[in-house]
Amino acid sequence: MPKPMPKALVTAWVAAFNRQDVDALAAMYAEDAVNHQVAEHPVLGREAIRSMFQAGFAAAEMVCIVENLFEDGEWAILEWRDPLGLRGCGFFHVVEGLIRFQRGYWDKLSFLRQHGLPIPQD
């Protein structure tokens, strides 16, 4: 079976994210993948990434609406928004059909406020 190209993999990632399917999401990452949402510390490894998604979905109703999705070689770039108006951008490095590295840019303070979550005081 051919390995999915970055754009196709990220399209499947968005569908799994919107279903809050942590098992499907985790399966898209390499065992030693890194997920770095710049508002947070990097998350290392597939199981830790699965736990990150579980915690996120338990805390807030998250939906990813694709604005633009680009592919360049091993990279996919996702520009997104959510129903509350939050916007962000994600970079996915896909190697042999799995996400090896992901970096996301979004406004954490706006996210916390929109979802009524506590704002850290550090």
Regions found by a protein language model. Give the residues of each.
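C-terminal and inter-domain tail/linker signature
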Residues: 1-122
